[in-house]
């Protein structure tokens, strides 16, 4: 990851005003907060449970990175992590995080993290940290041109707009009300919201603006990376479903692995554009790639994930 002086675009997020008071992000104070039990041993307690009733993979990745970051010095920062989800997590039981200090070098340090429940590993992760270093060799892709977040509806307003449609199919109405009732610690604005009154066949690509709810601040680069790890798993694998949703209904979907590469400092409590695409699906699996862009056009994070996707053909339904 490049120099730490600039954690994001200079304009920041003006729509928030000054949140440095008592609106500390719940992702920092609760969701990613770990209790130290011993040296390199931590316990996580607070879990957001999606509709699958399993632990949210992004939270496990984020907490594992929090644990790993506690074992390295202040002058090194994560540049990559590679994770496997090996068992389903139990949201009713705390997760223990064991950190192994695999290597501590002058420029690079490697940490292995194992997340355990009921005496068995549910998740394993390798994270590599690097001391900040200048580099004359630099390049990146160009950020897509999209409307700014201020011109787009937030998730709550978009759902409300869908629900006001008198022609909305009842099953979508039920699902949207369920989504609206959930408390999610991130804010999302879709760049091209889908029409829900009919199933569409879309390209396996989507983009949305995303940021953590609440205030994190400028100082803790490591925490912003941990929050980005949480954010990166949200709606990510679903990108692989977009070309198939008109013909197939998914009855099982779960992440198998997750990788991230951190390129430049950023603030996870400022809007970032998440550009997601799925280059391949087959063998009951789907592959997705993602890029998190700062508002000033800097590529901050690259992500990749493969997951199990099991589906069955849709039965034709009458349209209401």
UniProtKB/Swiss-Prot annotation:
Catalyses:
choloyl-CoA + H2O = cholate + CoA + H(+); chenodeoxycholoyl-CoA + H2O = chenodeoxycholate + CoA + H(+); acetyl-CoA + H2O = acetate + CoA + H(+); butanoyl-CoA + H2O = butanoate + CoA + H(+)
Q: What is this protein called?
A: Acyl-coenzyme A thioesterase 8
Q: Which InterPro entries match?
A: ACOT8-like_C, Acyl-CoA_hotdog, Acyl_CoA_thio, HotDog_dom_sf, TesB_ACOT8-like_N
Similarity field: Belongs to the C/M/P thioester hydrolase family.
Outline what the protein does: Catalyzes the hydrolysis of acyl-CoAs into free fatty acids and coenzyme A (CoASH), regulating their respective intracellular levels. Displays no strong substrate specificity with respect to the carboxylic acid moiety of Acyl-CoAs. Hydrolyzes medium length (C2 to C20) straight-chain, saturated and unsaturated acyl-CoAS but is inactive towards substrates with longer aliphatic chains. Moreover, it catalyzes the hydrolysis of CoA esters of bile acids, such as choloyl-CoA and chenodeoxycholoyl-CoA and competes with bile acid CoA:amino acid N-acyltransferase (BAAT).
Q: How is its activity regulated?
A: Inhibited by CoASH (IC(50)=10-15 uM). Also inhibited by cysteine-reactive agents.
Q: Which UniProt keywords apply?
A: Fatty acid metabolism, Hydrolase, Lipid metabolism, Peroxisome, Peroxisome biogenesis, Serine esterase
Single Gene Ontology BP term? Answer: acyl-CoA metabolic process
Q: GO MF terms on file? A: acetoacetyl-CoA hydrolase activity; acetyl-CoA hydrolase activity; carboxylic ester hydrolase activity; choloyl-CoA hydrolase activity; fatty acyl-CoA hydrolase activity; hydroxymethylglutaryl-CoA hydrolase activity; long-chain fatty acyl-CoA hydrolase activity; medium-chain fatty acyl-CoA hydrolase activity
Q: Name one Pfam family in it.
A: 4HBT_3
Q: What is its EC number?
A: 3.1.2.1, 3.1.2.11, 3.1.2.2, 3.1.2.3
Motif window: Microbody targeting signal: 318-320
